Amino acid sequence: MAIHLYKTSTPSTRNGTVDSQVKSNPRNNLIYGQRRCGKGRNARGIITARHRGGGHKRLYRKIDFRRNEKDIYGRIVTIEYDPNRNAYICLIHYGDGEKRYILHPRGAIIGDTIVSGTEVPIKMGNALPLTDMPLGTAIHNIEITLGKGGQLARAAGAVAKLIAKEGKSATLKLPSGEVRLISKNCSATVGQVGNVGVNQKSLGRAGSKRWLGKRPVVRGVVMNPVDHPHGGGEGRAPIGRKKPTTPWGYPALGRRSRKRNKYSDNLILRRRSK
C-alpha cells in the first residue's frame, strides 16, 4: 500500500494519509445496493450497538468466498478499494468468461494468475482443500463448513497457519491466537490478506471517521451518574469502584463474553489470546 502525504496548511489534510494507488471503479453486475436500516438500533428504535450512525452511502461488492470455479485459471485485472471491508479486492477474469471479485492476497499484482481446485500448486492466491496443503502453509479465507465459503481470516493482514493434520481434521492457528480443529475437506486460500498497513493509516480529522459510519466515543468518567457507573463526582474524580464496568454494570475487563455451551467448544484446543 502506497501512502500519500499532503503538504498543506490545514491540520486535517496535514495529518491525514491517503492510499494513492488503489481506486474504486466496480463492475455494475457485481454490485448491488443495500438498505441501511437501524444505525445501531433495534425494531423499537432503541440503541443496541453504540457509536454507529451516519456514514457515506455504499454499494455492496459481491465477493467470491467459495472459490468454486474449479480448475479454471483466472487473471487479476484490477485491485480495487472496497468500502465494506478494510481489505482490498481483486477483479478476476476467468478463462470461461466468468468475472468475480476475491480478497486481494498480499503481494499479488495485476496480471498474476490464480486457480482453485484439488492438487493445484501451492501458490499465493490459489484455493484448495486443507488436506492437499503441506504443514506450515500460511492461509486465509478459511471455510468452517464445507461448501459454505470462507469465514475465517478475512480482514486486512489476516493470516492463519496450518500446524497439524490428523484423521478427518486439520489443526489451525488463527490470527487471534486460537488453536482449533477444522475438517480437512474445507478449502482455504494460500497466502495473507493484503493491505497489511491499514493500522498505520491516519484519518487526520473527525469527519473522516464520520464518513465511515462511526460516531464519537465518550468516556464514562465524564458522564453523569445516571448515564454511567463511572460518572459523577466533583471535578476530575476516579471511577469510585474497584474495577471498571460497562455502562450496564458488568465487569469491563477480563470477563469472558463468549456464549456458553456452543457446539464448537470441543473443536477449540486453545483459547484466543487477549
From Swiss-Prot:
Biased region (Polar residues) positions are 7-25
According to UniProt, the name of this protein is Large ribosomal subunit protein uL2cz/uL2cy
Q: How does it assemble?
A: Part of the 50S ribosomal subunit.
Q: Which UniProt keywords apply?
A: Chloroplast, Plastid, Ribonucleoprotein, Ribosomal protein
Q: Which domain of life is it from?
A: Eukaryota
Which InterPro entries does this chain map to? NA-bd_OB-fold, Rib_uL2_dom2, Ribosomal_uL2, Ribosomal_uL2_bac/org-type, Ribosomal_uL2_C, Ribosomal_uL2_CS, Ribosomal_uL2_dom3, Ribosomal_uL2_RNA-bd_dom
Residue segments, region Disordered: 1-25, 224-274
Q: A single Pfam family, by name?
A: Ribosomal_L2_C
Any one cellular-component term (Gene Ontology): mitochondrial large ribosomal subunit
Location, primary (coarse class): plastid
Which organism's genome codes for this protein?
Answer: Solanum lycopersicum (Tomato)
Stored SUPFAM superfamilies: Nucleic acid-binding proteins (SSF50249), Translation proteins SH3-like domain (SSF50104)
**GO molecular function list:** RNA binding; rRNA binding; structural constituent of ribosome; transferase activity
List localization entries. Plastid, Chloroplast
* Family, similarity comment: Belongs to the universal ribosomal protein uL2 family.
Residue intervals passing through the bilayer:
none
Q: Per the UniProt entry, what are the Gene Ontology biological process annotations, in alphabetical order?
A: mitochondrial translation
